[in-house]
């Protein structure tokens, strides 16, 4: 949730320094400090719980690519999920003109030229998403954000392969 330069700095801190920094960050994000609850922190914890319930495969769901996007932006407005894509349900077909051709080709071209039948999810945020982490608070997100996750090996572990927004790779 931190900007890249702050994330690098944060990783270098001791455990005690990390705790102090996190507590200060939560105080700074509190939209209503006069109440006993920090609504941003509660929303963050709720999203972590949902990410762990939905996306845990080989490790905690909150650390997976889908979990990280979910925690940061919330529930997508639209999701297209294909667990067993066939014929006109392949990733290349589903993406159509939704992303730049060069990105689409990089995602869907196979070494053999055969159709790409990997399972995938496409998440689109139009209006509903609320980003946590933008300067330690919550903000409305840009409309039309798109994320493409692909299960490269068929084990249910989806990797973020395309993002229309900077900061999520």
What are the residue ranges of the model-derived segments?
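Residues within mature, well-folded domains
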Residues: 1-169
